[in-house]
Amino acid sequence: DRLRSRGLGDVYKRQHYNGLLFERLGKKLYLTERGKLLLPHAREMIRQFQQLEELMQNQGQSSTLKLGSTLTVGTCLTPSIILDLQKKIPDLDVYSFVTNTQNIEQKLLRSELDAAVVEGEIHSPDLVVLPIIDDCLVLAAGKKHPFYRRGRIHVQELNNQKFAVREYGSGTRQLFEDYTLRHDLKIRTAWEANSPRALLNAVLYNQMLSVMSIRLMHHEIRHRSVRVFCNEAGEWNRKFKLVYHKNKFLTPAIFELEKILHTYQQLELPSVMGVLEQE
């Protein structure tokens, strides 16, 4: 009887979904291609149902926000953003997850995060991307590097220089690698890290060059421990973006998050910077 009822259930599922969602091999179930197609939508429906229950049943009690940030954003902005959020919504419980753009994108697609603020490019058409906060990369040189006392550098002078760079999957690395390809540069990757602070230390103490967000170096620029060079052609200008799933149920916390991000929109630039020339 158990085998018969299981068989009838399989027939029903095949008819209802126009095909099987699972294949049974021995004692294990495996997703079919049709099942894999349904899975992210099912996860999002479950997540939306949980959020609706929270709104309806827990009025006046704490709400939650699972917020993703890429490493640059997580280092220089996320702590302040969370403080601002909790001032506006005192009972908000925020879970913060910081990693590179590639990992954040996958977590949003699997409904493991409610929203994220990223610096890199998002590729999935299932995610809504709202560019909000101005940012730019700059070339950084420490006091012991020959570039430190220069006012202008030509792009071709970057050839054969030792660089400290971010890991694969980073939006910062992708932007810089695209730049080196456009200008046919052959740099020497001597230091690779997923920590902006580790890259900055390589610049300060190991005579490396690095390209990173100017927002990460306000203290070092003020104290003249690094010299930064802006990209004359604006090729390193970018936006930090609010990202969430297109089917996401937008909670009051997400709406408030968007408002807060606009208060960080403008970029503070130092009065004195070097220039990286293109021609």
PLM features: residue spans?
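Short, small-residue-biased leader/transition segments that mark boundaries at the very start
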Residues: 1-12
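A short LG(V/I)-centered, amphipathic sequence patch enriched
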Residues: 14-31
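Alpha-helical linker/hinge and terminal dimerization helices associated
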Residues: 16-17, 38-59
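Central regulatory/effector-binding core of bacterial HTH transcription factors
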Residues: 62-125, 193, 276
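A late-sequence structural motif
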Residues: 77, 227-271
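Hydrophobic hinge/microswitch elements
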Residues: 100-105, 109-113, 118-119, 175-228
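Flexible hinge/capping segments at coil-to-helix
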Residues: 124-163, 168
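Secondary-structure junction motif
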Residues: 147-148, 161-183, 214, 250-258, ...
